């Protein structure tokens, strides 16, 4: 009973809140075992309480560790994100095939910033500029070298902030026309949208999209598009800018080439009242406006209209076509033009120079077959040439045909054509033709030759210095070769006026040489012994022997005239060495054995063999108008052959002298020789001396004297 009583009171007490502690008090003594058994539970609760205390003590440190790891993770993610953006912004990093590491990205970014800001130089205050140049001079030199003009426009509005004065020679516009206007007004209407896209710094739907050539798909450029807002982002585009009508008188002379280049790269002829445009290549950077540390006046604030960015660029003429032809070297009339055809001969492009060559406008020829302008008799020939050039695949083929011009006349045209092939598909894209007016080209070449002859006609022979050549065997050989070139019959006609300028006294002196055509210098009964032996020529000076027929005169000119007559009669081949031609005034000489210039102790005389001379009896030799020495080929061979087996230099100097002499016989044949006065300058001072030259009085020695010298190879006429 005790047991249920002990059990029920707690159950009953549980229903009464106020009697919870009443049954516990009397059971305090009797429930020793139960209390003892309940102690572990109480102790367990305390341990759980102690465990709570331990967890509460470790909680803040664990939470702090978890927070620190989270912070580090977020920081690493942000750093990776920023470095990825930096890698996309640096062109050198984005161009790499594989993704670089973080250190490489940072290093390339620093190098890129230095190159953009110019901090690679130690001095950033402009001290790198040469000290001898001012800023204005440096600016003009840069623009002159670039052959363009500098301009600054607001990025948002396109308002022109600055333009250099070099815009005048490039676009033929005064600087004042650009100030107060916008760049949109200066470009072609079809290029306005393209220019607006280049000046825009914000992203649009087409910004940052690139075409993948491998797959043919359009991809997003990623973070590269953020460079449009980046300071110093580069701009490069081509547009058509309007040309002005500034007078050429205000342009410097050194800009003629630029003007010709601008007309060449123009977009063809324009109609009346339409503006002319030129293709301009603009390169520059987007910069902040106004620059850091610079304040602009209030009146200039309206120009920028609160724009934060501006475009600083240089505009240069873009050469659309630069054909290599003669008329590009000067301001002459064009003689050729370019044309492009398809494989069927249809004209797809024509050079504007066709207006000056054939008279047609480019639009009159576009879309038409070239056979329509060809002569009916030449159409088959031209058609075959086009078919042949397609088969040649890149080789040049030329053809000449008659072309119908604008004024219904036939013009002889030479067309040099070749094909352009696609390097990938190896298919013929089009045919390029260079069409040249043959007649006009020949006229220009003839005019060029006339100008050259005019320049040569003013050449004064008296101003030519004559060097003192040493008289020797080696120099004599050189003089013979030079004489062949000077006195040849095939002389250039451009020098006719130079030879026609010989004074009248020289003509008179040479005229008397044709009067004695049948005389004989050396008669068959001459007392001279037979040919001289072939001993070595010991002296470089040769003296003319005292022949009875040659009398010493009181002047050098008289001796020259007599020797000329003897040459016309006997065809003596003057060879060998002779003293140098002093080119000075020589006083009258009396009958001496040796003249003063020949400083040799004893005079040497070399008698000639009478059989060595073959006088001509043909009347052609005495006729002034006939061919000099017409029977020269029928003469007996071998001059001075008594001591040699073969005759060297068989009369060649004689022919040379006769050719030069025959030019003056027909003009002054009736005049008599006038004696020169003592002290007068010697004739032919301007000509180089020749071996065996009769003007030197040394033509009566034989070729035997050079028998032992091997520097004169034998040759036949």
From Swiss-Prot:
Q: Which residues carry this modification: Omega-N-methylarginine?
A: 42
**UniProt feature, compositional bias: Polar residues:** 549-574, 585-605, 642-651
- Which residues lie in Basic and acidic residues bias regions? 63-73
Q: Where is the PAS domain?
A: 134-209, 323-393
The GO cellular component terms are: aryl hydrocarbon receptor complex; chromatin; cytoplasm; nucleoplasm; nucleus; transcription regulator complex
Concerning Pfam families, the annotation shows: HLH, PAS, PAS_11
Give every bHLH domain span. 63-116
Entry-linked Gene3D superfamilies: Helix-loop-helix DNA-binding domain, PAS domain
GO molecular function terms listed in the Swiss-Prot or TrEMBL record: aryl hydrocarbon receptor binding; DNA-binding transcription activator activity, RNA polymerase II-specific; DNA-binding transcription factor activity; DNA-binding transcription factor activity, RNA polymerase II-specific; protein heterodimerization activity; protein-containing complex binding; RNA polymerase II cis-regulatory region sequence-specific DNA binding; sequence-specific double-stranded DNA binding
The PAC domain is annotated at 398-441
Listed under GO biological process in this entry are:
brain development; central nervous system development; in utero embryonic development; negative regulation of apoptotic process; positive regulation of cell population proliferation; positive regulation of DNA-templated transcription; positive regulation of transcription by RNA polymerase II; regulation of DNA-templated transcription
Specify the domain of life of the species encoding this protein. Answer: Eukaryota
Q: State the signal peptide span.
A: none
Q: Where is the composition biased (Low complexity)?
A: 610-625, 658-680
Provide the effect of residue 402 to Q: Does not affect the transcription factor activity
Q: Give the UniProt keywords, A-Z.
A: DNA-binding, Methylation, Nucleus, Repeat, Transcription, Transcription regulation
**Predominant localisation class:** nucleus
Q: Which InterPro entries match?
A: bHLH_dom, Circadian_TF, HLH_DNA-bd_sf, Nuc_translocat, PAC, PAS, PAS-like_dom_sf, PAS_fold
Subunit record text: Efficient DNA binding requires dimerization with another bHLH protein. Heterodimer with NPAS4. Heterodimer with SIM1. Heterodimer with the aryl hydrocarbon receptor (AHR) or the SIM1 protein. Interacts with TACC3.
**What role does it play?**
Transcription factor that plays a role in the development of the hypothalamo-pituitary axis, postnatal brain growth, and visual and renal function. Specifically recognizes the xenobiotic response element (XRE).
Q: Which disease is it linked to?
A: Webb-Dattani syndrome: A disorder characterized by postnatal microcephaly with fronto-temporal lobe hypoplasia, multiple pituitary hormone deficiency, global developmental delay, seizures, severe visual impairment and abnormalities of the kidneys and urinary tract.
Query: Mind telling me which NCBIfam families this protein's record contains?
Result: sensory_box
Q: What is this protein called?
A: Aryl hydrocarbon receptor nuclear translocator 2
Q: Report the source organism.
A: Homo sapiens
């Amino acid at each position: 009973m005790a047991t249920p009583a002990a059990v029920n009171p707690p159950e009953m007490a549980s229903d009464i809140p106020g009697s919870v502690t009443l049954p516990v008090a009397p059971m305090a003594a009797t429930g020793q075992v139960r209390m003892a058994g309940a102690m572990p539970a109480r102790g367990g609760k305390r341990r759980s309480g102690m465990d709570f205390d331990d967890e509460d003590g470790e909680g803040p440190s664990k939470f702090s560790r978890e927070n620190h790891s989270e912070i580090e993770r977020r920081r690493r993610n942000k750093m990776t994100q920023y470095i990825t953006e930096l890698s996309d912004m640096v062109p050198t990093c984005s161009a790499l095939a594989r993704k670089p590491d973080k250190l490489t990205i940072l290093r390339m970014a620093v190098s890129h910033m230095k190159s953009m800001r110019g901090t690679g130089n130690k001095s950033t205050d402009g001290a790198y500029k040469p000290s001898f140049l001012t800023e204005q001079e440096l600016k003009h030199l840069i623009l002159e070298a670039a052959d363009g003009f500098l301009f600054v426009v607001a990025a948002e509005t396109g308002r022109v902030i600055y333009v250099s004065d070099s815009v005048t020679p490039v676009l033929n516009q005064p600087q004042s026309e650009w100030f107060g206007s916008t760049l949109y007004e200066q470009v072609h209407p079809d290029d306005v949208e393209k220019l607006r896209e280049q000046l825009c710094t914000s992203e649009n739907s087409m910004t940052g999209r690139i075409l993948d050539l491998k797959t043919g798909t359009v991809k997003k450029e990623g973070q590269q598009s953020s460079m449009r807002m980046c300071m110093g982002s580069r701009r490069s585009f081509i547009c058509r800018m309007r040309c002005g009508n500034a007078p050429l008188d205000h342009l410097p002379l050194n800009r003629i080439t630029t003007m010709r280049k601008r007309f060449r790269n123009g977009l063809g002829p324009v109609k009346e009242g339409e503006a002319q445009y030129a293709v301009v290549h603009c390169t520059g950077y987007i910069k902040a406006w106004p620059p850091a540390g610079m304040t602009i006046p209030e009146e200039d604030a309206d120009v920028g209209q609160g724009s934060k960015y501006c475009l600083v660029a240089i505009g240069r003429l873009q050469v659309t076509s630069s054909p290599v032809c003669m008329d590009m070297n000067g301001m002459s009339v064009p003689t050729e033009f370019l044309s492009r055809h398809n494989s069927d001969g249809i004209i797809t492009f024509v050079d504007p120079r066709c207006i000056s060559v054939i008279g047609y406008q480019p639009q009159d020829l576009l879309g038409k077959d070239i056979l329509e302008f060809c002569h009916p008799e030449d159409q088959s020939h031209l058609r075959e040439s086009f078919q042949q050039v397609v088969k040649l695949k890149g080789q040049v083929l030329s053809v000449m045909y008659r072309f119908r011009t604008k004024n219904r006349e036939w013009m002889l045209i030479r067309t040099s054509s070749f094909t352009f092939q696609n390097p990938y598909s190896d298919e013929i894209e089009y045919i390029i033709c260079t069409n040249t007016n043959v007649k006009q080209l020949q006229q220009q070449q003839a005019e060029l030759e006339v100008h050259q002859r005019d320049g040569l006609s003013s050449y004064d022979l008296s101003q030519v210095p004559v060097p003192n050549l040493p008289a020797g065997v080696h120099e004599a050989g050189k003089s013979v070769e030079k004489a062949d070139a000077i006195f040849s019959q095939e002389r250039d006609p451009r020098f006719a006026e130079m030879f026609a300028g010989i004074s009248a006294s020289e003509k008179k002196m040479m005229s008397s040489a044709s009067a004695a055509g049948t005389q004989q210098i050396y008669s068959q009964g001459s007392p001279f012994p037979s040919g001289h032996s072939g001993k070595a020529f010991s002296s470089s000076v040769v003296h003319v022997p005292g022949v009875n027929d040659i009398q010493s005169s009181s002047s050098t000119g008289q001796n020259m005239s007599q020797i000329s007559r003897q040459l016309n009669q006997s065809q003596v081949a003057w060879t060998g060495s002779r003293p140098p031609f002093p080119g000075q005034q020589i006083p009258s000489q009396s009958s001496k054995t040796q003249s003063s210039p020949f400083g040799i102790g004893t005079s040497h005389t070399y008698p000639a063999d009478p059989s060595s001379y073959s006088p001509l009896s043909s009347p052609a030799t005495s006729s002034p108008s006939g061919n000099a020495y017409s029977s020269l080929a029928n003469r007996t061979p071998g001059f001075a052959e008594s001591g040699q087996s073969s005759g060297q230099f068989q009369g060649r100097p004689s022919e040379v002298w006769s050719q030069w002499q025959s030019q003056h016989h027909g003009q002054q044949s009736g005049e008599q020789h006038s004696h020169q006065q003592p002290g007068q300058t010697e004739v032919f001072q301007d000509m180089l001396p020749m071996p065996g030259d009769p003007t030197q009085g040394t033509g009566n020695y034989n070729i035997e004297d050079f028998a032992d010298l091997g520097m004169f190879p034998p040759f036949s006429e």
